[in-house]
Amino acid sequence: MEKRYYIAYGSNLNVHQMRMRCPSARRIGTSALKGYALLFKGSKTGSYLTVEKKPGSSVPVGVWEVTQADEKALDRYEGFPNFYYKKELTLPIKGIRTGKVRKRRVFVYIMHEYSPIGVPS
């Protein structure tokens, strides 16, 4: 079973919510998404958190190891590919158990750039 690393911000940092959405997901560490900032964007029905490129900024993220089934559940939750798209990155991940830093290939959900800026809903 192939596992991938997912970087989370916002509601997907909530351990209880992630357990409900992705029962096999495992917290493995933390990192920072450098050169990005958090902001709310959305649609007529509401605004949601996303990340967007912004030089000099940084977003702290949690890192989850997810199975293919977990990733499919996240795709549904995030409205992929219509509302959010996935971006692949390589980031240094600080392990929860060991504190060691290792570079890992990760994916993150980012709202499409054409979505208007909004306020939390």
Indicate residue ranges for each PLM-predicted region.
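Glycine-aromatic micro-motifs
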Residues: 1-121
